């Protein structure tokens, strides 16, 4: 029987975007995990995950820690293209939805993208 380990990977950190992966591994095989923050483009995320032997199929949700742009920059894109649940606090969810409503009033279609991705924690 193999040992199951938990690994934390810093995929990107700094003002250019923050994104982390927390997962369970059996040796080199990922058994599932979560993505923490959405600060990098989906294209960049896929590339970084690939470099670590992972894909977007290896996480089941995205956890948002706070609403600084370097942590949420690509959240709408993740919601639209990945169809993963988004986990965050009620206060942060309200703040993100409030911003989204302002964008929607300008003709943006972000509201539906974020709304479709939310789950209660």
Feature locations, PLM:
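A generic structural signal for alpha->beta connector loops
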Residues: 5, 83, 105-107
